[in-house]
């Protein structure tokens, strides 16, 4: 199985990768389109990018409440870097912006939250797994996808057929292992900014 086929079977990683490539090239409207597609398949990094783009007005008019809405969806699983982003955005919203974020947030969580989006991805993985049976592994081809803190995550060709990439529960666990509190030795970052605790949440 070639790297393109592997990514086609994993639309969360595929569209996240396409989104980052477009973003790096300055094609922000195109990047946003790809991140939205990845977000449909429960991709939390893509949802965090949509939060940043809305908040800063990258490829769209600035929209701080929607920046928070996307950050809230991205932080759903408790990934530390996305929780920090959500907390920072909430602390900077004024009362009217918070009201709007609360008003619009439930619809986005319903569509892009794990209850819907992981189900969507699980169905896709199951279909793709049936199609890939009988294929020939390509051990010489690796896949690189955007990972935590701007680094890339490598998936080696000899792992393409590993169960963890095809069985939904195992795949979700693998994604969590990559993104939830990444080991210090895998990243080079500065200290995280502290966030004041005890703020009221919707």
Give the location of each predicted region.
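Short helix-capping/linker turns of helical repeat alpha-solenoids
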Residues: 8-12, 22-28, 40-47, 56-58, ...
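Solenoid-like repeat scaffolds
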Residues: 37-40, 110
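Short coil/turn linking the two alpha-helices of tandem helical-hairpin repeats
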Residues: 20, 51-61, 90-94
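Extracytoplasmic and endomembrane cell-envelope/extracellular-matrix remodeling and assembly machinery
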Residues: 2-3, 93-202
């Amino acid at each position: 199985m070639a790297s393109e086929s592997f990514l086609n079977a994993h639309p969360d990683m595929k569209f996240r990768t396409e989104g980052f490539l477009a973003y790096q090239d300055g094609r922000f409207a195109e990047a946003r389109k790809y991140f939205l597609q990845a977000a449909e398949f429960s991709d939390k990094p893509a949802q965090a990018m949509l939060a940043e783009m809305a908040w800063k007005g990258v490829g769209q008019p600035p929209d701080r409440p929607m920046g928070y809405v996307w950050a809230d969806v991205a932080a759903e699983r408790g990934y530390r870097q996305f929780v920090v982003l959500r907390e920072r955005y909430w602390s900077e919203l004024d009362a009217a912006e918070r009201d709007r974020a609360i008003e619009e947030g439930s619809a986005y969580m319903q569509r892009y939250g794990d209850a819907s989006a992981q189900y969507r991805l699980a169905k896709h993985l199951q279909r793709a797994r049936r199609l890939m049976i009988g294929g020939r592994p390509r051990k010489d081809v690796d896949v690189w996808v955007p990972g935590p803190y701007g680094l890339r995550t490598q998936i080696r060709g000899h792992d393409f057929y590993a169960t963890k990439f095809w069985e939904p529960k195992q795949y979700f666990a693998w994604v969590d292992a990559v993104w939830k509190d990444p080991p210090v030795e895998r990243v080079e970052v500065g200290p995280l900014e502290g966030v004041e605790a005890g703020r009221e949440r919707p």
